[in-house]
Amino acid sequence: MKYQILFGVVFLTLLSYCYSEIEDEFENFVDEEMVEADDPFSLARKDKENCIPKHHECTSDRHGCCRGSMFKYKCQCVKIVNAQKEETERCACITPGLHKAAEFVVQLFKKVIA
C-alpha cells in the first residue's frame, strides 16, 4: 500500500512538472514574436535576464516570472483597498502550493534514495 502511495505521489509530481513545461512553452509561443536567430539559445538567455524574480512585483508583466528549481513561478494577484476605499491590484511572482508540495516530495524522495 505504501508503495502505491509513493508511486502515486511521484507520478503526480512528474505529471505536474510536465504540465508546467508545456504551459511555459505555450505561453512563450503565444506571447513572444517569432524571431530567427543565429544562436538558438539567445532567446532563452534573453528571457532569463529579463525575468522577474520570486516575490517581486509582476503587475505589468504577468508572464515574465523566472523559473524556480523545478517550476516556473506564477504571477498571483490580490486586490488591495486603501483608507480612501480605492481598490488597486498588486501582483507578485510566487510558487503555487501544488508546486511547493511537489518540490517537497522530490526532495524527500531524494533523501530516501540517497
UniProtKB/Swiss-Prot annotation:
Residues 21-45 form a propeptide. Expressed by the venom gland. Keywords: Disulfide bond, Secreted, Signal, Toxin. GO terms for cellular component: extracellular region. InterPro entries: Spider_toxin_CSTX_knottin (IPR019553), Spider_toxin_CSTX_Knottin_CS (IPR011142). It is found in: Secreted. One of its GO terms (molecular function) is toxin activity. Its main location: secreted. Disulfide bonds join C51-C66, C65-C93, C77-C91. Residues 1-20 form the signal peptide. It comes from the Eukaryota. Belongs to the neurotoxin 19 (CSTX) family. 04 (U1-Lctx) subfamily. This is U5-lycotoxin-Ls1a. It comes from Lycosa singoriensis (Wolf spider).
